[in-house]
Amino acid sequence: YGSCAIDHNGKGRYSTKMGHGDAIHLTHFDPSRKGLQVWDCHENKRDGSTYRDAATGEIILQVKSNKDVGRCMAADIDPTQPGVEMWSWEAGMRNAKGEAIAGRIKGLPTNMAVWWDGDLLRELLDKNIISKYDWKAQKVNRIVTFEGALSNNGTKAVPCLQGDIVGDWREEVLLRSEDNCSLRLYVSTI
């Protein structure tokens, strides 16, 4: 099945029948729309990326692709747009209404979002690098590279752990050392 929703009682709510995807984002994207929405990418070389109502499965936007769209991302990275922005390898950047606001942006990570620099926008974590999207110039700026540290799971490039460990609402990143002998906890100095 994949691309399905399970209700609070454990029963299936719906299936889009679009199969498995490597990334799915569930949140309240659009402040003017009731309920939660889903941004999902599909590996079936047909359905591309879909933005849908989480409760009903109604597709709000679909960007079809004949490729395996293995990665998509959603985070609030542009303060000029209400709600959460979304993008994928194939879709360019969309606002919470599903409208195109930027084409494919070179180097825009599609891996993880992190609260790093203390402002209300998200930063982007990919491998051992944290970047910030510059919405004015529509480009990505590197904030920090964690030298001597590696991510996990090959192409998935995920940290050992990411979360607010210190308790200041920013998030810390836990990575393994290159020699696999230790774990390193990185804390924002911004």
Regions found by a protein language model. Name each.
Residues Y1-I190:
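Extracytoplasmic/lumenal domain signature
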